[in-house]
From Swiss-Prot:
May function as a substrate receptor for CUL4-DDB1 E3 ubiquitin-protein ligase complex. It comes from the Eukaryota. InterPro entries: DCA10, WD40/YVTN_repeat-like_dom_sf, WD40_repeat_dom_sf, WD40_rpt. It comes from Xenopus laevis (African clawed frog). One of its GO terms (cellular component) is Cul4-RING E3 ubiquitin ligase complex. This is DDB1- and CUL4-associated factor 10. Keywords: Repeat, Ubl conjugation pathway, WD repeat.
Length: 457
């Protein structure tokens, strides 16, 4: 009988283990994990473990001292080229593995170059304070492929929808403009104004291009759900979900435009319950958002609940799970890095939709280099964050083990864990970027130096 008891216990234990394994397998499958679904996941997990041994490896050999501050860094999708957007009209190209200089586009623009975006392994776009966007071909860098005119103020960032081959740009004129790169000529591309809002700072598309996020200097975050870039959004033509604070169920604005705070970025002259007014009946019955429905949020920022803040930097998790914000107080005496998880699902009441974002992690940043925007980024697998921190960068994780976000979501917002700090600059770091293919990080600073970081053993 004793042996039977032991055997029975062993069988029961084995059965529980098998059941547990099945549940873990189902969970991983629902999250898109597995060798067949995400073959690069294990490689990225191994790569992430190497970042604890990362050190400053080299500084790129700059052939010119006329480029000024480095505002943006961008790797080509295959990791073979590192591009620099510089203060003094220049774009610099390097081989990130050898640190060798490839080319300097000395007159890429007529003013500061703000952002670079690769469309594929050979084509990339740049934007500038000269109000233009330029397209370039790596095989022919002696001249621009074409120049795009349409903005009336500084152009600050570029996004690209690979499915439709539409280029999306935003600027301080408050406009988001769509460019059809399928019909580009030397004279430019057909374009249209897609959206307009006041106080626009940054615009991003989620990896699947189902949402557009727009940050503002007034502390609002705008989210366009069920995104359709083929339709221009005129004032009053899109459904508006009431503005609200991310961690609260209370509305931040009235349902009437006459009582909306003056700093609200939304433009709408109609009164009445906006969500009910513009949402289609079919969408109300099904509990789904209509195409291009606009949600206006006031993200919760630690320590800034009673003070306004400016959302200066905006990034998206590579798997679309979360958004990453860099916020500064209106008095410019505090800076925070915050992570907000996307909350999907049908709201309990359509007339009072659930907030799409929830604050999960945060950390206070060094308050140096006031007035300059610091561009932070996710690692390729989304396990880590590289954030400018004074004269260096910090590598941050959701926990000390660098687990994926979905595996360590707290019930209440917690602090990001510092994995490593790297200081190799002599001036304030403004931008940082992970290589998409190699265990390497690049950072650029206000005085124009670019540092590369790699593991050393």
């Amino acid at each position: 009988m004793e042996g039977c008891t032991k055997d029975g216990a062993a069988v029961q234990s084995s059965g529980a283990s098998t059941a547990g394994s099945i549940f873990w397998w189902l969970k991983d499958r629902s999250l898109g994990r597995g060798i067949c679904v995400d073959p690069a996941r294990d490689n990225f997990r191994t790569m992430t473990s190497l970042y604890s041994s990362i050190h400053p490896a080299d500084s790129v050999n700059l052939s010119t001292r006329t480029h000024g501050a480095v505002f943006n860094l961008e790797y080509s999708p295959d990791g073979s080229v590192l591009t620099l957007a510089c203060e003094q009209t220049e774009v610099l190209l390097f081989d990130p593995l050898s640190s060798k200089h490839i080319k300097t586009l000395s007159e890429a623009h007529e003013d500061c170059v703000n952002n670079i975006r690769f469309l594929d392994n050979r084509m990339f776009a740049t934007c500038s304070d000269d109000t233009t966007i330029a397209l370039w071909d790596l095989r022919k860098l002696n001249s621009k492929a074409c120049t795009l005119h349409g903005h009336t103020s500084w152009v600050k960032n570029i996004e690209y929808d690979k499915n439709t081959r539409l280029l999306v740009t935003s600027g301080f004129d408050g406009n988001v403009i769509i460019w059809d790169t399928n019909r580009c000529t030397e004279d430019g591309c057909p374009h249209k104004k897609f959206f307009h809002t006041r106080f626009l700072m940054r615009m991003r598309l989620t990896p699947d291009c189902s949402k557009m996020l727009i940050s503002t200097s007034s502390g609002y975050l705008l989210i366009l759900h069920e995104l359709d870039l083929t339709k221009s959004l005129e004032v009053g033509s899109y459904p508006i979900l009431r503005a609200r604070r991310t961690a609260s169920t209370s509305d931040m604005t009235s349902t009437s435009s006459e009582t909306r705070p003056s700093s609200s970025p939304c433009h709408n002259s109609d009164s009445g319950p906006l969500f009910e007014k513009h949402m289609s009946r079919s969408s109300q019955r099904e509990g789904t958002s209509p195409r291009n429905s606009l949600e206006v949020l006031t993200p919760e920022v630690p320590g800034e609940r009673d003070r306004g803040n400016c959302i200066t930097s905006l990034q998206l998790h590579p798997k679309g799970w979360a958004t990453l914000l860099r916020c500064s107080s209106n008095t410019d005496d505090q800076e925070w890095t915050c992570v907000y998880e996307f909350q999907e699902g049908t709201p309990v009441r359509q007339v009072s939709p659930r907030c799409s974002l929830r604050l999960t992690h945060y950390i206070e940043e060094a308050n140096v280099g006031r007035g300059y925007i610091k561009e932070l980024c996710f690692s390729p697998d989304g396990r880590m964050i590289a954030s400018p921190h004074g004269y260096g960068i910090r590598l941050l994780g959701f926990d000390s083990q660098c687990k994926e976000l979905v595996d360590c979501l707290p019930k209440e917002a917690g602090t990001l864990q510092e994995i490593r700090s790297l200081y190799s600059h002599k001036d304030v770091v403004l931008t940082t970027k992970f290589s998409p293919t190699h265990c390497q990080i690049a950072s650029g600073c206000l005085s124009g130096r670019v540092s590369l970081y790699q593991p050393k053993f």
